[in-house]
Regions:
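Conserved donor NDP-sugar-binding/catalytic core segment of glycosyltransferases
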Residues: 93-134
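Acidic donor-binding segment of Leloir-type glycosyltransferases
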Residues: 23-62
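Glycine-rich, basic loop-to-helix element that forms the pyrophosphate-binding segment
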Residues: 63-80, 96
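A recurrent flexible, glycine/aromatic-enriched loop bordering the glycosyltransferase active site
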Residues: 70, 121, 134-173
Length: 360
C-alpha cells in the first residue's frame, strides 16, 4: 500500500486537476490519496475536499491552523508507518500507470530511497532540458507524452544528487532510518527535500530518476521577492549543513547523465509527426540559447570573481603595509618608553641628590 500525500492550501483549479488526475489513473499498486488541508482559506477548496472525503475517494487531514508545507507533509507521512509514500504537489498532474512505474523503480534496488520522475518544471529533472519552465512541451498532451517516456526509457533509472520534491517517492525503510523532513530549519518549504536526500545519502540510500515517467508541474507563475528571499535563506542553511551540495549538483549538470534519455524521447516525438518534430527542433534551439545565456552568466560571475580577487589582493597588500607600520610604531613606542624610563630615572636621581644637599 502506498500513500499519495497531497498538501493543499490555495489554488482551487490546480488542486482539482491534480486530484482528478490521480483518481483517473489506473494502477496495479494499491494506494490511498491522503490530502492534508493546511487550513486553506479558499472555501471552494474546502467544499471540494469535503465532497471527496464523503464519497470515500480521499483520506482528509485538516490542520487547525496553517502549519506550512513541511509540517503538513510530515503529518501525512506519519499516518501509516508501514507504507511507502509519494509526495505530490497540488499543482501537478499525472497520467497512465505513473505510480506503478515509480514503485517499480523504487523497488528495483534495495538501496534506492527516493525516486523522482521527469517533468516540465523540475530543475535538474526537467524535460526537454534542465532549466525549462515553459509549460507542457509540444502538442501531444500529458497522457501521450508520458506514454512516450514509458516506451522510450522502460525501467531505466539514473542516480541523482538529490530528489525533487514536486513528486517524490520515498521508501518507508529510508524514511524510518533518516527521519522526517526538518521543519525547524526548512519550515517554509524550500530545501527540505534536498536536505532529506542528502541525509539519506549519508546513510547509504540513493536518490534516482525514473526515466520512464513524466509528470506535469505547473510551478510558481512568478518568482516573488519573498520567495527569492526564502530560497536564499534555505540555500544558505542547506550549504551550512551540506557544504558539498552545490558542487555535486554542478558536476551532475555538466555530466548530463539524463541527456540520452531526453534524446530518446525527442526521437520518439520527432517520429510522431511533422508538427511535433517542429516543436522538438524549436526546443533544441531554445536549449542552445539557454546554454549560451548560462555561459554568459558564468563568464560574468568569473569576471566578478577575478575583480573580487584583485580587490582582496589589493586589500591584503594594504593590510601588510598597515601591519608593518603598526609594528614600526610599536617598536618606536617601546624605544620611546625605554628612553622615558631612563629620563625619569635620571631626574629621580638628580632630585634625590638635590634633596640630600638641601637637608645638609
Amino acid at each position: 500500500m502506498i500513500d499519495v500525500i497531497i498538501p493543499v492550501y490555495k489554488g482551487a483549479r490546480e488542486t482539482r486537476r491534480c486530484i482528478e488526475s490521480v483518481l483517473g489513473s489506473r494502477q496495479r499498486a494499491l494506494f490511498a490519496i491522503v490530502v492534508v488541508d493546511d487550513a486553506s482559506p479558499d472555501r471552494e477548496i474546502v467544499g471540494y475536499l469535503d465532497e471527496l472525503e464523503a464519497r470515500g475517494q480521499i483520506a482528509l487531514e485538516r490542520n487547525e491552523r496553517n502549519l506550512g508545507f513541511v509540517r503538513s507533509v510530515n503529518r501525512g507521512m506519519t499516518l501509516h508507518p508501514d507504507r511507502d509514500v509519494v509526495l505530490l504537489n497540488s499543482d501537478t498532474e499525472v497520467a497512465n500507470d505513473w505510480l506503478d512505474r515509480l514503485q517499480r523503480s523504487a523497488l528495483s534496488q534495495p538501496d534506492i530511497g527516493t525516486v523522482t520522475p521527469f517533468s516540465n518544471n523540475a530543475t535538474i529533472c526537467s524535460y526537454p532540458f534542465e532549466g525549462w519552465t515553459a509549460g507542457m512541451p509540444g502538442t501531444l498532451g500529458l497522457a501521450a507524452l508520458d506514454a512516450l517516456f514509458a516506451s522510450a526509457n522502460p525501467g531505466r533509472t539514473v542516480d541523482l544528487p538529490t530528489g525533487v520534491g514536486f513528486c517524490m517517492y520515498i521508501r518507508r525503510a529510508c524514511l524510518v532510518e533518516v527521519g522526517a523532513f526538518d521543519a525547524e530549519r526548512f519550515g517554509r518549504g524550500y530545501g527540505e527535500e534536498n536536505d532529506f536526500c542528502l541525509r539519506a545519502a549519508a546513510a547509504g540510500w540513493r536518490s534516482v530518476l525514473a526515466a520512464d515517467v513524466f509528470v506535469f508541474h505547473q510551478g510558481a507563475v512568478s518568482f516573488s521577492e519573498e520567495r527569492a528571499a526564502q530560497t536564499q535563506i534555505a540555500t544558505s542553511t542547506l550549504l551550512d549543513l551540506h557544504p558539498g551540495y552545490v558542487r555535486r549538483v554542478r558536476e551532475f549538470i555538466v555530466r548530463d547523465p539524463l541527456g540520452a534519455f531526453r534524446a530518446a524521447v525527442d526521437s520518439a516525438r520527432h517520429a510522431s509527426g511533422a508538427d511535433e518534430a517542429r516543436h522538438v527542433l524549436a526546443e533544441r534551439t531554445e536549449e542552445r540559447a539557454h546554454l549560451v545565456a548560462r555561459l554568459a552568466e558564468i563568464e560574468q560571475m568569473r569576471q566578478g570573481l577575478s575583480h573580487a580577487e584583485a580587490l582582496v589582493a589589493e586589500r591584503d597588500e594594504e593590510i601588510v603595509k598597515l601591519r608593518s607600520a603598526l609594528g614600526h610604531a610599536e617598536s618606536l613606542a617601546i624605544r620611546r618608553g625605554a628612553q622615558l624610563e631612563r629620563i625619569h630615572a635620571s631626574w629621580l636621581g638628580k632630585l634625590a641628590i638635590y634633596l640630600a644637599r638641601t637637608k645638609s
